[in-house]
Amino acid sequence: YRPLRSTFRTKGDICMTNKRLRLTPSEINVVMSMRNNNHNPNNTLLIPDLHCPFCHDDALTFCKDMQEKWDCGNIIFMGDILDNHYSSFFASDPDGMNGGEELERALSQIDGFYEAFPEAIVLNGNHDHLPNRVAFKNGLSSKWIKTLDEMLNVPGWTFKDEHWIGNIKLIHGTARVAHTRMKQDLCSIISGHYHSKSYIQYLQGHNSRHFAMQLGCLIDRNAYAFAYSKQFPHQ
């Protein structure tokens, strides 16, 4: 038996016992958190249209479960993280939330996703920038408008129009569905945008093979913002 030497604190609040560095409880928590979040960088979690504040109540839990299940080290939001129903070019529900209330609720939901996924790529969706289009249409200079990352206060997120993983092109999407873009761009495509379409199709040529993946969405289909699609044949 050999008694321990005295323990003391340094300016960095690090314990010293037998001249060996000891982490404080708070530092241990940081290290354990980093270890727990050390997912496989070769696996990517794709999070399709959220349309906050009208995303499904279980969307965040589902995404976190999928990250753990498939050990995903990369996170990509496929666009339309916001809905901006109040500023739609189409008729908005007069009994719905006003612009301020909708934004506050959306930011609250986004905070949950940012806490769960502090580093991510976010593809720009058509709904994300509806207020900018309204401002432009009415002659308001972009100098008066905050960018999306400034408004959301998510410094760990990178906003892009498209992203490539090898030879696979990821986009939010437009009126052209994924398999149409695959044939036009002659590359593999992963796309969001269409809430009622989810599939994988392939294109085989003599010297190449491509695929088109059309993702679904994580919306609450019963929310008033999606009343327009109630009668769609595909749900």
Walk through the language-model features, giving the residues of each.
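Flexible, charged surface loops at secondary-structure boundaries
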Residues: N38-N40, E68-D71, Y114-A116, L152-N153, ...
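Conserved beta-strand segments of alpha/beta enzyme cores
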Residues: N43, E119-I121, T158, K169, ...
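Conserved beta-sheet core of the metallophosphoesterase superfamily
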Residues: W164-Q235
